[in-house]
């Protein structure tokens, strides 16, 4: 277990002082000059320079494991746009891959695993996981990116949530109905909890190692939490997200933690019951309503989101109007901080890069 405060991490790596702390201030509910903004999947296939670097690497995982190229693609959107954060270029499925399931990608079909995790025999064959060793290439990338940023903006580390990773590991890839995962949930819930507990321990180790390597914020992507029924969300997803956050807060109390549950807007009352600094929202939840719900809690929780990524297919005028409406909602309660502008999910490969710039600029041009 690593217990290092932020000063220890900064001094160990001799990182440059942070110049733009707008996003961190918003997370702390401190006054800000303008709304901080970044985009999920901001280093991605909508950028021609990303496509060129990925082609040089040969395939996606080779790109992730190449420190110099992973650093390069992380920096690319920051050269184009006035973003307020960088996010580590990697994939949420690095943990299952390191556990020996054999991650690979098929064109047009997304990620797949050579092995699945459906029986106790499968579980017993999982390889031992130690983030610093099993995923050393991720930590190398984190440190390299921090040095390349030179204090420009803070760096997000991230992981998939236990529930989301479990669905991939059990299904063997993406799924529309989560047949095998939900089959375990309703027929062998104790075994599914055993799997989730094991993955949660790995996630804590993984995010802890990213923080020690230089990540200044971490985000937990609960991409498929919204596939669960209400009571099952609390038991099979939130319970484990809460444990991740609590453990990270014990080890690194000064490092903000964001939890993003796609489709989780209905369960803000459940998600409030954690130490998360910020909750990410998709486009289905109005920001004014979300902030009003969170304001009833015992402590302040920031919000991140939540423009529909498809909005970026529209005209520049439409994008600006949509951003203004989103920020009107975000600040409707009168509090002009505690909010990070983002998309409601990752930016898609078909977006015109110019329109992504319109989005970022429109956020910064909004008068607080």
Curated annotation (Swiss-Prot):
Any Pfam family hit: URO-D
Site (Transition state stabilizer): 91
Protein's pathway: Porphyrin-containing compound metabolism; protoporphyrin-IX biosynthesis; coproporphyrinogen-III from 5-aminolevulinate: step 4/4
Keywords assigned by UniProt, alphabetized: Cytoplasm, Decarboxylase, Lyase, Porphyrin biosynthesis
EC numbers for this chain: 4.1.1.37
GO cellular component term of the entry, any: cytosol
Highest taxon of the lineage: Bacteria
SUPFAM superfamilies per the UniProt record, alphabetical: UROD/MetE-like (SSF51726)
One GO-annotated biological process of the protein: protoporphyrinogen IX biosynthetic process from glutamate
Complex and partners: Homodimer.
Protein name (database record): Uroporphyrinogen decarboxylase
Species this chain originates from: Psychrobacter sp. (strain PRwf-1)
């Amino acid at each position: 277990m690593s217990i290092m405060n932020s000063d220890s991490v900064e001094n160990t790596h001799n990182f440059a002082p942070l110049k733009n702390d707008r996003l961190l201030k918003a997370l702390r509910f401190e006054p800000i000059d303008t709304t901080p903004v970044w985009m999920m999947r901001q280093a991605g296939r909508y950028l021609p320079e990303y496509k060129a670097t990925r082609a040089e690497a040969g395939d996606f995982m080779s790109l992730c494991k190449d420190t110099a190229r992973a650093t390069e693609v992380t920096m690319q959107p920051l050269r184009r746009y006035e973003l307020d954060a960088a996010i580590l270029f990697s994939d949420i499925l690095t943990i299952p891959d390191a556990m020996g399931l054999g991650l690979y990608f098929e064109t047009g079909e997304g990620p797949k695993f050579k092995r699945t995790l459906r029986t106790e025999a499968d579980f017993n064959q999982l390889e031992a996981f130690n983030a610093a060793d099993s995923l050393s290439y991720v930590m190398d990338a984190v440190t390299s990116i921090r040095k390349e940023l030179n204090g420009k903006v803070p760096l997000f580390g991230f992981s998939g949530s236990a529930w989301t990773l479990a669905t991939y590991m059990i299904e063997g890839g993406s799924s529309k109905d989560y047949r095998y995962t939900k089959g375990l949930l309703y027929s062998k819930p104790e075994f599914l909890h055993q799997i989730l507990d094991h993955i949660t321990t790995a996630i804590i180790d993984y995010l802890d190692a990213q923080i020690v390597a230089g990540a200044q914020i971490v985000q937990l992507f609960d991409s498929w939490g919204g596939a669960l029924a209400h009571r099952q969300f609390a038991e099979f997803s939130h319970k484990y997200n809460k444990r991740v956050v609590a453990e990270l807060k014990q080890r690194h109390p000064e490092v903000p933690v964001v939890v993003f549950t796609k489709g989780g807007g209905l369960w803000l009352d459940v998600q409030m019951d954690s130490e998360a600094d910020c909750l990410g929202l998709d486009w289905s939840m109005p920001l004014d309503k979300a902030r009003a719900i969170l304001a009833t809690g015992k402590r302040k929780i920031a919000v991140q989101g939540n423009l529909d990524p498809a909005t970026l297919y529209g005209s520049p005028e439409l994008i600006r109007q949509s951003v203004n409406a989103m920020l009107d909602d975000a600040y409707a309660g009168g509090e002009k901080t505690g909010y990070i502008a983002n998309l409601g999910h990752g930016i898609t490969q078909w977006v015109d890069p110019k329109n992504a710039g319109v989005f970022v600029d429109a956020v910064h041009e909004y008068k607080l």
